Curated annotation (Swiss-Prot):
This is Ribulose bisphosphate carboxylase large chain. It comes from the Eukaryota. SUPFAM superfamilies: RuBisCo, C-terminal domain (SSF51649), RuBisCO, large subunit, small (N-terminal) domain (SSF54966). Belongs to the RuBisCO large chain family. Type I subfamily. Residues 1-2 form a propeptide.
């Protein structure tokens, strides 16, 4: 055999299956600043050692396959393979452990969340040797972060565009979410905006259905925006949902929104997909549109504690892909959300640098290297009695969104909006005066009721409403 045709097999290639840990478990490895780091919650099948399971995750999410192949000899596995570099037990869980995996940056296409997730949370989640697998956190290195545009505008630019400072923004999702005609929908938008809200919102499943085509909705909502702006002297917006069946149609809807001169559009980033979302985010930056992101489908992925992907990972992915707002739970409303865990990923959305803090579920220090921040949106089962807690939990850089908590007011949409605005202004003023919202919240709301009949009526309607259910996805060590 000539040297030109010599194969790996002829110089010692050995076919067959070998244990993953022989190649992919490397506890001596020192991580690099350019590595993408992942923390997986691994539940191996009975009889599978933790080291083998962790190595299997590293292999199947990077360069490995189920058997040895001769083409391994045509590249440098040592350069490209993922490495399980540390394993630790999970408190209170005998069958689970956390496996830390480092991925070389060269494994990923620049500026592509789609490609990053295809590797890290791809086929490995169906691997038979694992009973369950969950991605708890990712460390995105600055070298990779810098390949993304990120949010179209970010928190400070949004405040400058809207001329709104020193308080959370107020929103409302129009209800019923499906079934209204475009004209009646626009009327509901107008009533909410003139009552004092900053934004109204399409529900996530409002796209372009037979009862209300998208173009008609956009036109009537634009009319509502301009009319309410003229009456109040404040800049208003409505999240026009541009989500569509194709990227081309999505961009067409965003173009029409820009032509109408409205300030913001919306996208369902998980059902629409990261490729579509990044495309829309780029269009929004180039054309001066803010981008509101809904997380429909997230609970399919993130709610179960032992399998899937934690929302903090989806939040980081959204900041890379692009969005100026994203729904982030409420802690106090009808939807799932542990307080410390929620505050952890809220910081990951807003702040430029976030230290590792396992008490809040943050496994890695994250440096965003000046990537614009994202406003967290608190939405789902909240009303005026929640306003002190929401203001205290989320702070000024947030959007507090009341759907039923606005439209369910006994006097109508505009009085419902007035009630929310009065409650918010009262809470912000009390906080600025040094009062403790966590302790005095109810008293602050009762005081405001004395000079706002709209707020008093809202407080009477919702005084007994509670959503007292335990959180499913708790941090480790919590009972």
């Amino acid at each position: 055999m000539s040297p030109q045709t010599e194969t790996k097999a002829s110089v010692g290639f050995k076919a067959g299956v070998k244990e993953y840990k022989l190649t992919y478990y490397t506890p001596e490895y020192e991580t690099k600043d350019t590595d993408i780091l992942a923390a997986f919650r691994v539940t191996p099948q009975p009889g599978v050692p933790p080291e083998e399971a962790g190595a299997a995750v590293a292999a199947e999410s990077s360069t490995g396959t189920w058997t040895t192949v001769w083409t391994d000899g045509l590249t440098s596995l040592d350069r490209y393979k993922g490495r399980c570099y540390h394993i630790e037990p999970v408190p209170g869980e005998e069958t689970q452990f956390i496996a830390y995996v480092a991925y070389p940056l060269d494994l990923f296409e620049e500026g592509s969340v789609t490609n990053m997730f295809t590797s890290i949370v791809g086929n490995v989640f169906g691997f038979k040797a694992l009973a369950a697998l969950r991605l708890e956190d990712l460390r995105i290195p600055p070298a990779y972060t810098k390949t993304f545009q990120g949010p179209p505008h970010g928190i400070q630019v949004e405040r400058d565009k809207l001329n709104k400072y020193g308080r959370p923004l107020l929103g409302c999702t129009i209800k019923p979410k499906l079934g209204l005609s475009a004209k009646n929908y626009g009327r509901a938008v107008y009533e909410c905006l003139r009552g004092g809200l900053d934004f109204t919102k399409d529900d996530e499943n409002v796209n372009s259905q037979p009862f209300m085509r998208w173009r008609d909705r956009f036109l009537f909502c634009a009319e509502a925006i301009y009319k309410s702006q003229a009456e109040t002297g404040e800049i208003k917006g409505h999240y026009l949902n541009a989500t569509a069946g194709t990227c081309e149609e999505m961009i067409k809807r965003a173009v029409f929104a820009r032509e109408l001169g409205v300030p913001i559009v919306m996208h369902d980033y998980l059902t629409g997909g990261f490729t579509a979302n990044t495309s829309l985010a780029h269009y929004c930056r180039d054309n001066g549109l803010l981008l509101h992101i809904h997380r429909a489908m997230h609970a399919v992925i993130d709610r179960q504690k032992n399998h899937g992907m934690h929302f903090r990972v989806l939040a980081k992915a959204l900041r890379l892909s692009g969005g100026d707002h994203v729904h982030a739970g409420t802690v106090v409303g009808k939807l799932e959300g542990d307080r410390e865990s929620t505050l952890g990923f809220v910081d990951l959305l807003r702040d430029d640098y976030v230290e590792k803090d396992r008490s809040r579920g943050i496994f890695f220090t994250q440096d965003w290297v000046s990537l614009p921040g994202v406003l967290p949106v608190a939405s789902g089962g909240i009303h005026v009695w929640h306003m002190p807690a929401l203001t205290e939990i989320f702070g000024d850089d947030s959007v507090l969104q009341f759907g039923g908590g606005t439209l369910g007011h006994p006097w109508g949409n505009a009085p419902g909006a007035v009630a929310n605005r009065v409650a918010l202004e009262a809470c912000v003023q009390a906080r600025n005066e040094g009062r403790d919202l966590a302790v005095e919240g109810n008293e602050i709301i009762r005081e405001a009721c004395k000079w706002s009949p709209e707020l008093a009526a809202a407080c009477e309607v919702w005084k007994e409403i509670r959503f007292n259910f335990p959180t499913v996805d708790k941090l480790d060590g919590q009972e």
